[in-house]
Amino acid sequence: MNTFSQVWVFSDTPSRLPELMNGAQALANQINTFVLNDADGVQAIQLGANHVWKLNGKPDDRMIEDYAGVMADTIRQHGADGLVLLPNTRRGKLLAAKLGYRLKAAVSNDASTISVQDGKATVKHMVYGGLAIGEERIATPYAVLTISSGTFDAAQPDASRTGETHTVEWQAPAVAITRTATQARQSNSVDLDKARLVVSVGRGIGSKENIALAEQLCKAIGAELACSRPVAENEKWMEHERYVGISNLMLKPELYLAVGISGQIQHMVGANASQTIFAINKDKNAPIFQYADYGIVGDAVKILPALTAALAR
């Protein structure tokens, strides 16, 4: 048996649901999808869900992860084994841990390859900070996986599909974290997974102010702006959602233009599937040039304006 009898899917990020659903179609005969609202339920059915389970009734001061108890109960009630697919977001990984505990299931994070043999999943993912690929065969009846962005192509919606909708009512967990306040994050909506052209900046750009030069290039060629992990996590020059690398975005654009990025393996794992890589770096020995199809050795602050002017003609 090279598929599971059923798979359970949940995504806290709507843009990640299509790829998870495509993976679910390849890995199981029946697809169950947990959703948070009616609109997500309609989308899930159009993407291939046989059954939609709407999570309902959570108080405003509780977090989505507190649904883990009723989600696990629902999964157990409908089969003695199964596969759970979640995005490798922060919330996805936290929920995976909670579901793994409740289902007595093995949990594997950041999966990049999944196969099924004899009803058991074999998972490959990066280990040792991206220096190697680990392979794990999951022996527990249930398997809980968080999936790296770009592992599957996005499923295409089909409005003619039909499915059954159910409601899963909130049950307060015995122990939970209560949210006391919410602060909106200042962030521009972006879906880098779908971008054809990506301009990505590293610390070699020099300063937060110099990122405007990359933004002007993006505007000239219709690209999306991304960054390396140090730019987002260390310098705080850009938001977390835009950094490319092993623990976040895994992109497959037609063009990846790396500006001031050294090219460490942890970053390149997220960019190496690009059709064409163009690098700009003042260090001729930077590892990025080992991956690049084209490269310019020089100061990005001087090169970007000239490149923008040439491409804007």
Swiss-Prot record:
Pfam families: ETF (PF01012), ETF_alpha (PF00766). Gene3D superfamilies: HUPs, TPP-binding domain. GO terms for biological process: carnitine metabolic process; fatty acid beta-oxidation using acyl-CoA dehydrogenase. Pathway: Amine and polyamine metabolism; carnitine metabolism. It comes from the Bacteria. Keywords: Electron transport, FAD, Flavoprotein, Transport. FAD binds at residues 255-283. InterPro entries: DHS-like_NAD/FAD-binding_dom, ETF_a/b_N, ETF_a/FixB, ETF_asu_C, ETF_asu_C_CS, FixB, Rossmann-like_a/b/a_fold. The keyword Electron transport applies. GO terms for molecular function: electron transfer activity; flavin adenine dinucleotide binding. Heterodimer of FixA and FixB. Required for anaerobic carnitine reduction. May bring reductant to CaiA. Belongs to the ETF alpha-subunit/FixB family. This is Protein FixB. It comes from Escherichia coli (strain 55989 / EAEC).
